Amino acid sequence: MKLTSVHHIAVINSDYEKTYDFYVNKLGFNVIFDIERPAKNDRVLMLELDKGLMLEIFIMPEPPVHQDAPEAAGLRHLAFGVESVPEAIKWLNSRGIETGPILMDTNNNINKPVVFFWDPDGTPLELHE
């Protein structure tokens, strides 16, 4: 077997309207499908960016809270590539999305700027040049 790509990433959120507004209206993801699953008491949004990254969001009432510190095993954050972190920060801020400070990724002498921001349920998101 040979793995060829990451097909999608799945996260859990609690509020449909806030999640839809954040990922679709503010970040520009396209909706692939949006279905309610009454038997599971949830809703599933499958979203995609132009370059093929798919994000599957399960929206359910009162999901377990994301543990931030001490860090837990599992998904730590999602990172998206951008051409310019400072320009991306301006773009996010113009849409009402707060960001953290610009940090420098010094791993392996990369020395590229990164910034974190959070989705409506606190999932850490990173922008990386």
What are these regions (language model features)?
Residues 1-18, 75-78:
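N-terminal beta-strand motif that seeds the catalytic metal site of vicinal oxygen chelate
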Residues 2, 89-129:
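Vicinal oxygen chelate
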Residues 5, 41-43, 74, 111:
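Exposed loop/turn and edge beta-strand positions of beta-sandwich/beta-sheet ligand-binding modules
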Residues 11-54:
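Core segments of cupin and vicinal oxygen chelate
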Residues 32-33, 42, 62-68, 101-102, ...:
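A short, acidic/glycine-rich surface segment
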Residues 50-54, 62-63, 85:
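Short, charged/polar surface micro-motifs in flexible loops or helix N-caps
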Residues 56-58, 126:
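Conserved beta-strand in the GNAT
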Residues 71, 78-86:
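Mid-chain, well-packed structural core segment of small domains
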